[in-house]
Amino acid sequence: MIEDTDFEIFLYISKNKYQIFVFDKNYLKNLYNEEIKNIDEIELNTLSKFLDENIYKIEKMIKNFIRDIILIIEDDKVLDVGISLKKNNYDKDINQKYIKNTLVEIKDVFRENYQDQIIMHMIVVDNDNKNDDYLFLEVNFISITNNFTFYFDKLLESHQIMISRYMSGKYIKSYIGEDLAEISIMANKLNNGSNKNEVQLVSKNVKNTGFFEKFFQLFS
């Protein structure tokens, strides 16, 4: 039996194909990789059959149940929004706590203005605007609407599987191009903080004392 801490399951969804991976976190390679082509649309019946076939095969292979999955979505419904904030720095001391609090403010601005969106990625844009009098931060948010993800949540719930995270296929492919065999490898790296400018978000239900699981090293 393969322990569920030894692997990650990625499900890639686009209008052109569905693809499911079992990624070995110890050996950093795919143990399983299956796909099915689409005809320019996301069709839930086809996806349901694809999951029925492959979840059974995967659980038989790993001799364990799939409890959660990382969903990679590539679709024109994925939103990419930039928000910037400039704050006076009266103490003349910009430390990580100050930056963290500012990022929480920016995140709250996004939440207030895009209440129907799930944040997939929160990325701090590099800038050379260093000034002791103020802090300027520009952040890109990549998100997806709740209405779009609702059907995937319900579909996987029928298999007793929870979606642990949503990721953007376009964002991942910006690092690897169109080679989808590598998408699970890059998704694993990004999920573990390989982009030091990406803020790693965690649910408050997981940690009561922290909005950030890892803090990027942009200002260190």
Segments predicted by a language model, with ranges:
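Conserved blade-register residue in beta-propeller folds
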Residues: 20-22
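Eukaryote-biased detector of low-complexity, proline/serine/threonine-rich segments
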Residues: 66-68
